Every structure is written in structure tokens, then in C-alpha cells.
Amino acid sequence: MNYKIAVVGPIPHDTIITHKGNTIVKYGCVTHPTIALSKLLKGRGEVIPISQVNKRDVSPILELFKPYSNINTSGIFSDSDQGTSIELKFLDQNNRVEKQLSNMKPISPKDVEPFLDVDCFVFVPITDFEVKLSTLKFIKENSKAKIIFDAHGPTTFVTDNGKRLRKYWKDKADWLPYIDVLKMNLEESICSHIEEDYTSEELYDENRTDHLEDFAKNVLKHGVEYLYVTLDSRGCAIFSNEDNELKHDFIKSVSVNNVVDTTGCGDSFAGGLSYGFTLYNDYVKAAHYANALGALRTQGKGFDVFKSLEETNNLIEETYS
């Protein structure tokens, strides 16, 4: 069977200063799950990155994807010459300061229309304006594809001077009916549930999880099938409804010894979810692949960190058998 997964969001030109002081320059976000999925789907399916990019970035992006024959690049648009550039400085392994240098033109229904036959759309926006709500509505009305959505976008905004800050996801009730699987990290779950001014507050507290059950009930009430909340190196929490009762699962992480770069871990995790749901329609298997891709992403600066299906399955087997 020829599976098709579309990865939707920005392909930013990233300048990354790691927590160890190293500088990495590369194209990020959509590229991580796209290349990871291309390796998992080799010989069995294709991956379609859908993004708006700067004209100057088209050639290097196409060159980046060129070694992977099952990446369909017809969804990379540059007609508006409006892509994303970002500078990221890591304070420690997980926390960073971000500055946005240019903004992407939002993904519209017109951009996704040629790809309505895919099995899954996985949205990985990193800022609140990058995907239009009308785009999700259009897919729901015209496609049978599963919609996986990363809450990084709607919980992040850009100030006039390019500073990237957290925000409360005020209109989430408008979005949730058009999302099948919602993915976020713990910090984003707080920004999605508790209405506060987050612009100057240190949000991250790995022990602050007491809000999750109430938040999950609200999310699932609006039609979302599964809520995944990543808990960094611990693993991920999954919330769903079973017999009208809230079901809470915890899936431990895939352990790694040396973390080189955590940029793109969330995007890679979302890509793993799309693989598990597309091939197995199994929320636990989806978490296994998500944790595996997120862990692999930390292991180096390049895309060679992602492995073949056989190697990835071996990693999953070692962790979860």
C-alpha cells in the first residue's frame, strides 16, 4: 500500500546555539518529521512537506530533500517569498530563548487542496499565525485524513521586535473540533489551560501536572480523540475517552545517553504519531514511534540521526518489549 503523510508548517532557516555553546545552522521544523518519515516509509509510501518559504531558500531546501526519493516536494511554495527565519539560544538542555527574524505566509486551504487524498495531515506550526483555522475546517469537510496538530503554534506569538513568547491559547474551543490528535509539551498544556500573562513568567516546572486531567476532559469534550502531553525525558501522557470515562496512559521515553541537540524533538514526535496512526491506527504504537523519533532527534546535529524502519523497530522493541 502506498501510504501518504503530509507534514504542514514552516521550514525555518534556523541558527541554533546549543546549551554547550556550539552553533548550528540548518533548516528546521517540517524537515525533521519529513526526513524521519521518509526513512520509515521507504518503499511503502511518500511524505509531502507543505510550506511557504523564501525564494532564496527553495534551492537549498530541495537539495536537502533530494536524497530521499519518497519526499514529494510539490507542496513547497515560494510565490509570496515569505518564509521563516529564527535564532534559537539554548539556556540548558530543554529551555531556550527564541528570536524570529522573518514570518511565513500562513498555510491556507489552497495550499493543502492538492493533497486531500493523504492518509494523515500532521501540523507542526511554531507560531500562532502560521496555519489558518479555515485550513483545518477545509480538510475536515473535504478529506478523510486524520489531523494531528501540535499546540506549539497557538501557544506562541512574535512581538514587534521578533521576540518569541508564550501566550494563552484563548480560542482553542474554535480549533479543537477540527483536530483528531492534539500534541503538546507540559509548558504548552499550561498555556492552553490556565489564562494568565505568560510573557515574563518562568513556566516550566516538570512537577506541575495537576491541571492535566481537567484540561484533558475539556479537550476531549470538544471532539479531540487523543491528547498527548510530552514530559521531556520521562515520556508522554496520553488522555482519551473510554466508555465515557477519562483514560490516562503513560508511555515511558526511549532513553538516550548523550543529548547533542533537542531542536526539532517535538516536531519529530508529531511525525512519529502520524506514522503510528497511519499504519496501525493504534495510539500506543503511535506513542512508541513518537518517542523513538524524538529520542533519535537528540543524537546529533544532522538528519542522519533518523534510522531505517528496521533499526527504529529494533529500538522500540528494546524499549517496550
What are these regions (language model features)?
Residues 2-5, 13-24, 39-125, 129-130, ...:
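Conserved N-terminal subdomain of the carbohydrate kinase-like
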Residues 3, 168, 193-321:
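Conserved phosphate-binding/catalytic region of the ribokinase-like
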Residues 6-8, 120-122, 148, 183, ...:
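Structural motif
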Residues 10-11, 268:
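Active-site metal-binding loops of divalent metal-dependent hydrolases
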Residues 31-36:
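Short amphipathic alpha-helix
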Residues 37, 185, 266:
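Short, conserved phosphate/pyrophosphate- and ester-handling motifs at nucleotide-, phospho-/glycolipid
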Residues 115-116, 173-176, 221:
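A short, aliphatic-rich alpha-helical micro-motif
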Residues 125-213, 241:
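Conserved beta-alpha-beta core of the PfkB/ribokinase-like small-molecule kinase fold
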